[in-house]
Amino acid sequence: MDQQNFYKSKNKLIKLFKADGRWLRIPENKGECVVLSDLHNDGRTLDFIIDTYLVNSKDAKIVICGDYGDRSPSSWLSKPTATLDSLLKLKLKYPDRIFMLMGNHDLNPSKYQNFMPCEFWHSLSEHDEGFYTEILESLPVVTTFENGVIMTHGVLPSSAIFDDFDLASIALMESLWSDYTEDVPVKTDSIRKQKGLDDFKRSMDSFNCNVLIKGHNPYAPLRMFDNKCVTLQTTRVFEGVCGRHIAIVDLGKPVSDVNDIKLVDLGILHGK
């Protein structure tokens, strides 16, 4: 797809993303879904995942839990939008197999919460800034499967009842920016607020789910809360901090805890 046709696809992409509001429900109960998070412009890893799990399967799905730009791996010599562009084009080609959630790096810092690093946003022309802002503002925040798995970027909203497209909502902003922790007491005095076990249980009960798959925090344990929460980082940027993982969910199998999900270490499978 050439650049002009890509620009013309903006309204189609927004319509696809807005179809289910901020809470995307995926009703399928067969096949597999690969879940990843925090690609941060790691196109090499994305290409490997697409080639391995999407192209070679007729019904496999992929969910990405946000943070598509910034922190580009030094060995991925490409423009800051490269990985996001690839995903958006894949969404157009496979609208029922590629699902993208919103991360905190995906909201324009000139309109919402400022943050660093944000080389993705700083690299854009005025036209491109408007193009990506409108598309990324339309992304869902939460995705659920019927087998008890829920996905988000940071933490879950405290209630399953939240405004579909109100980006000024405190609940939505806290979902993108906050972290879960098993530490006590819980810190609440920064943009990256901490949520504890009670918050986690309250949200999981509200959404009627058993296991959360999320991203956002490379310093979080891979498994938390008695095997009810998984934190993924898929980019090579944090390889030495937390490893590089994806989760594979069997959509036809009830999931009661993390042991019912396959966690794959891409550092071992894919190498550097």
Regions found by a protein language model. Give the residues of each.
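Active-site-proximal loop/helix segment associated with metal-binding centers of metalloenzymes
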Residues: Q3, Y7-K10, M116-D128, E134, ...
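N-terminal active-site segment of His-dependent metallophosphoesterases
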Residues: M1-T81
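A generic secondary-structure signal
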Residues: F48-Y53, S86-L90, R202-S203
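Binuclear metal-dependent phosphoesterase catalytic core
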Residues: C229-K272
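Active-site environment of divalent metal-dependent phosphoester hydrolases
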Residues: H40-R44, D70-S74, H105-Y112, P157-S159, ...
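Active-site neighborhood of phospho(di)ester-bond hydrolases with catalytic His/Asp-centered motifs
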Residues: V35-S37, I62-G66, F99-N104, M151-T152, ...
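Short beta-strand scaffold segments in enzyme catalytic cores
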Residues: P140-T144, L222-M224, G243-D250
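Active-site neighborhood of divalent metal-dependent phosphoester bond hydrolases
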Residues: K30-E32, K58-K61, Y68-M151, P157-S158, ...
